[in-house]
Structures are given as C-alpha cells and as structure tokens.
C-alpha cells in the first residue's frame, strides 16, 4: 500500500521565503513509518502583487481556474484545494474526472454512502472496491479523503437503520451504525484498503459523526488494522470540537463538517428554511468552535480541513485560514472564486480577520469585522 509521511487533507505551509511547498515529514502514530515517498502536486509559487489581476481573470474562467494550483495569501501560507465529488457507483468516476480537470489538488470529501443507497442489501467488498478505484484512479499521486458510510438521519438504509427513530438527526447515524452493524464498517475498510493498494492515490480515511475520544480511538484502530495508515475523524458536533486536542492524540487529521456543526451548535434543523439564519457558519459560536479546532491542529502541527459549505464562501475562506484551517474542500465550480479571494489577501490579514470575528457577538458583526480587515488596501 502506498503510504504517506505527511498526512491527509491539508495544505502544507510555505513561508514567505520558500518557493515550494514544505515537505517536512510528520510523525506517525504507533511507530508507523512512512513507506513510499510522498508524491506532491505542483509546488506553490510566491506571487508578486501584480498577480491580482491574473487571479481575477482565472476566477472568471470557472472550473478552469483550478489549474493554477498554489493559491496563497500573499507572503503567507500556500493553500491546496480539494474538490468534493459525490462517490456514486455510476457517477463517482465521472465526477472525479470533472474535479481533476477543474484543477483540484485531490478529493477533500469522497462520500461513500452513495455506494449503499437504493439497495435492499449492502454492497459486497468487491463492488465497493470497483467503485472506490474508479474515483482513486482520477487522482494518481494526489490525496483522496474518504468518508466512511454516513447513513441514517436523512439517508436511512434498510439493511442498517432497522428501527424508525423519533429524532434521526440525533440517532444511529455515521460511525454509530457500526455499533449496530459492525460488518458494514469492517467490509468498507477492507474494500478501501484493497482499492488503495491497487491505485496510486494517497488515501486518507475518516469517520463521520464522532462525538467521543473513545469512538475516534476505536475507529483508528480498525482502520489501521487493515493497513490504512492515515486516519481522521469528522468534527461535526460541539463535543468533538471541544475535544479536538484529545482527538488529535489518536488520529492523524480532522475535518470540520460545518453544516452539521452549525446545526448541532445552534440546535436548529438545517432542513428547515425558516431557521436558515441560525444554520450559518458565520455564527460566532460556530466560528469559535472552528477556532478551537484550528488551535488544536496548530499546537500539534496536524492538518485541519473544512468540507462543509463554508469552504466554498470566498468571504469566509480567509477567515478559516486565519483560524487555523489548512485545507478547504469544495465543488469544482467554487475553486476559482475561493483561490482568487485568498490570493488577494495576506496571511497577516487572515489572522487579523480571524481574531476580529472571534470577538463578534452576531453573524452580521462577524461578517462586518472580517470585511473591514480584508478590504483591499
């Protein structure tokens, strides 16, 4: 299996006097060594100030904008971009090819539940291997962050969610399905390990709906037992966000699912349009939780990603960078807009904007505070 010394889902820091992305090895858990050499994407180049006009032109080209790989805040950190194609058995490879053509550095969220939907029984290991290989093949030598089955709630499965739940959003969903049907997770992890062995993509695997350190530890042990070496968890609940430092003691990276994080933090069903103003990643409580996770990642020098809709917001992306986020996952069409937004600001502005929003009392205040700091000078 191809193994990576520098783990998943993240951009790599390039200081202002570096012309290429830093390639320092990161420590492995449990004494695991790196194995094969990491195959990086194109190195990020430092851009002069006159590059702003080019960034705007690139952004207008839509999905082709992603061809300019190393978008970065000026005199600051290199950012790598990940796309988020759905992992449908039939459409997965085609969507992955679209993302690759759009210039994505990899896949920041490979949704595997689409292999399981519209079925009366679980897919076999062989069926899953074929589906996963179709996506991995589109990103040779690049990172693909795979989320294990996230069914339940709005995506119930007849062979996993046996009982109707009065409140499925708080019920048996995500990793919790493994309690009821452990064979589902075991088979999926085996299939991912086989697919990763057969392809050259750098595979990272993460579990959704993790709330406790025990859950993170158990998942990491299961994934590593089949040979998957880069293991993470989703941060979608306030519990996981508050325990981010402890989570990062047992996993290699974390990825913030801002859609669910907002829903659970504000106690507002994200399916209800009338509560839309509460399900807003600009809500100060959500931003402070993101900041706490970013602080934990910085303290341990481990990757922190965002794969919710917040990552595709050009106004919010610099704030997320300032809060400590190291990778952003978005649809291919959003790549250019977000890249252009980051190219227009400095790392210092990102950090200042993050500090400003942490002091905000309302979502409107947070937007205004960030805009004031990030306004063109």
Language-model features: locations:
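Acidic, glycine-rich flexible loop/linker segments
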Residues: 1-104
């Amino acid at each position: 299996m191809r193994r990576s010394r520098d783990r998943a889902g993240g951009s790599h820091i390039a200081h202002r006097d570096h012309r290429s992305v830093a390639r320092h090895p990161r420590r492995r858990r449990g004494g695991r060594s790196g194995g094969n050499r990491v195959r990086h994407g194109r190195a990020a180049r430092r851009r002069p100030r006159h590059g702003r006009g080019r960034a705007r032109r690139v952004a207008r080209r839509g999905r082709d904008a992603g061809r300019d790989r190393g978008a970065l805040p000026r005199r600051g950190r290199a950012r790598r971009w990940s796309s988020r194609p759905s992992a449908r058995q039939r459409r997965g490879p085609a969507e992955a090819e679209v993302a690759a053509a759009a210039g994505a550095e990899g896949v920041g969220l490979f949704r595997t539940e689409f292999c399981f939907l519209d079925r009366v029984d679980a897919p076999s290991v062989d069926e899953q291997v074929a589906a996963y290989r179709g996506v991995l093949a589109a990103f040779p030598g690049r990172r693909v962050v795979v989320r294990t089955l996230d069914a339940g709630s709005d995506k119930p499965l007849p062979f996993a969610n046996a009982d109707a739940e009065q409140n499925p959003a708080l019920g048996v969903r995500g990793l919790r399905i493994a309690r009821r049907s452990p064979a589902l997770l075991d088979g999926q992890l085996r299939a991912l390990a086989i697919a990763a062995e057969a392809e050259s993509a750098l595979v990272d695997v993460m579990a959704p709906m993790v709330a406790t350190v025990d859950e993170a530890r158990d998942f990491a042990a299961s994934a590593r037992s089949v040979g998957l070496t880069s293991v993470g968890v989703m941060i979608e609940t306030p519990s996981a966000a508050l325990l981010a430092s402890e989570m990062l003691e047992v996993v290699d990276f974390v990825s913030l699912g801002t859609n669910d994080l907002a829903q659970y933090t504000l106690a507002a069903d994200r399916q209800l349009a009338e509560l839309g103003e509460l399900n807003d990643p600009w809500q100060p409580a959500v931003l402070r939780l993101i900041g706490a996770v970013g602080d934990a990642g910085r303290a341990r020098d481990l990757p922190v990603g965002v794969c919710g809709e917040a990552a595709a917001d050009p106004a919010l992306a610099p704030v997320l960078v300032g809060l400590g986020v190291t990778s952003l996952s978005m649809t291919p069409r959003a790549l250019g807009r977000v890249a252009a937004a980051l190219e227009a600001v400095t790392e210092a502005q990102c950090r200042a904007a993050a500090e400003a929003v942490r002091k905000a009392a309302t979502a409107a205040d947070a937007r205004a505070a960030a805009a004031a700091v990030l306004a063109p000078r």
